[in-house]
Amino acid sequence: MLAFLNQVRKPTLDLPLDVRRKMWFKPFMQSYLVVFIGYLTMYLIRKNFNIAQNDMISTYGLSMTELGMIGLGFSITYGVGKTLVSYYADGKNTKQFLPFMLILSAICMLGFSASMGAGSTSLFLMIAFYALSGFFQSTGGSCSYSTITKWTPRRKRGTFLGFWNISHNLGGAGAAGVALFGANYLFDGHVIGMFIFPSIIALIVGFIGLRFGSDSPESYGLGKAEELFGEEISEEDKETEENEMTKWQIFVEYVLKNKVIWLLCFSNIFLYVVRIGIDQWSTVYAFQELKLSKEVAIQGFTLFEVGALVGTLLWGWLSDLANGRRALVACVALALIIATLGVYQHASNQYVYLASLFALGFLVFGPQLLIGVAAVGFVPKKAIGAADGIKGTFAYLIGDSFAKLGLGMIADGTPVFGLTGWAGTFAALDAAAIGCICLMAMVAVMEERKIRREKKIQQVNIA
């Protein structure tokens, strides 16, 4: 029934290497565009919820705590799915898996729309459909990473993955425009248009994506990327292959027993409190506390994503200039985040609000990218998916969930850790950023030792 998700591996064509290399580009670009556009579209049917919050409050009388409960459902299933669904997808045709999951997620969001009537809602159905949507979206990043890794040479993989990484920034930045167009032009200003229109787009993108590309050049008889581009298999990968380690053995040895991965997991928890805390509540804070218009509030949300796009491209490059010191560069960004949060909290006018959100997007997505890049440096290629999965699971189950429900309760006036109101919300954001700095500083020390150790080995080999 789901045979289209199985991997296809054809015998290598009896053609010269340079001919097969020329044949590589077209199917690669098809596959690359499918995962890029597919992941971008996932954000259109995820971030529209953030855009619609003020209208859901005014139309249906939902409280911030209830909105937080809906978001919590997504966070839990997304977090669990990051490990479970990604583990299942490993060994499947990941290029096909992503658009299939996009289609299922879009169907769930249509169900979410149906749970909102003319003037009433079913909170249970809203939580259920949004949670299912999160479960299906959870493997989007892992499938994209797996597909691109199988297609590209190591020396250019960072460029391709770095550019792919802006897909979710573009999706987040475009979510407001797509959602508002659906509501204002297709549904006479009703909030359900913010969910139905993006879902229809996602269905179209998903079905088209199933028709183009595949997860590896081996699907076309072109051979492995290493063979096509004259690269040796890395030492870490050779070790796992020579020992014939199973996926579970690799997961235990290189992830569960890896203290750096655990430090990065907890760093990611704190970072997600900051990132999702800003992302989830910026429009509500601007409208309720700063007394700005809904239009300006949404502009700030969009600028946060635009700043993230720029930051995603720049911070990785800066860490390369620092000779791979990802954690150290992340600490610099985190220190700047704390200072900028103060400006955002006390924004005196809309221009300060907009500028501070752009700056926060630029800064927050630097450490998010660098935590992932740092993790890659401490595991073999076969463990990257597992490391990314467990890191994401912790971030969403704890960090994302607290940012949505915990911060929502604090803003509503419910004491959490002795914090109440918007002042308490910002105190929690500051504390999370400080916690992330402390953990990343520990990673920076271990990263420095690794860099110096590898440098000595390289000097010995040259001598």
UniProtKB/Swiss-Prot annotation:
Family designation? Belongs to the major facilitator superfamily. Organophosphate:Pi antiporter (OPA) (TC 2.A.1.4) family.
GO BP, sorted A to Z: glucose-6-phosphate transport; phosphate ion transmembrane transport
Residue spans, topological domain Periplasmic: 46-60, 118-122, 181-189, 281-297, 348-357, 404-425
Q: Which InterPro entries match?
A: MFS (IPR011701), MFS_dom (IPR020846), MFS_trans_sf (IPR036259), OPA_Antiporter (IPR051337), Sugar-P_transporter_CS (IPR021159), Sugar_P_transporter (IPR000849)
Induction data? External glucose-6-phosphate induces the expression of the UHP-region.
The job of this chain, per UniProt, is described as: Mediates the exchange of external hexose 6-phosphate and internal inorganic phosphate.
| The protein's name in its UniProt record | Hexose-6-phosphate:phosphate antiporter
Give the superkingdom in one word: Bacteria
Q: What keywords is this UniProt entry annotated with?
A: Cell inner membrane, Cell membrane, Membrane, Phosphate transport, Sugar transport, Transmembrane, Transmembrane helix, Transport
Q: Which residues lie on this side of the membrane: Cytoplasmic?
A: 1-24, 82-96, 144-159, 211-259, 319-326, 379-382, 447-463
- Provide the topology term for how it sits in the membrane: Multi-pass membrane protein
Compartments where found: Cell inner membrane
GO annotations of cellular component type: plasma membrane
PANTHER family in UniProt: GLUCOSE-6-PHOSPHATE EXCHANGER SLC37A4, HEXOSE-6-PHOSPHATE:PHOSPHATE ANTIPORTER
- Which sequence ranges are marked TM in the entry? 25-45, 61-81, 97-117, 123-143, 160-180, 190-210, 260-280, 298-318, 327-347, 358-378, 383-403, 426-446
Alphabetically, the GO molecular function entries are:
glucose 6-phosphate:phosphate antiporter activity
Chief place where the protein resides: membrane
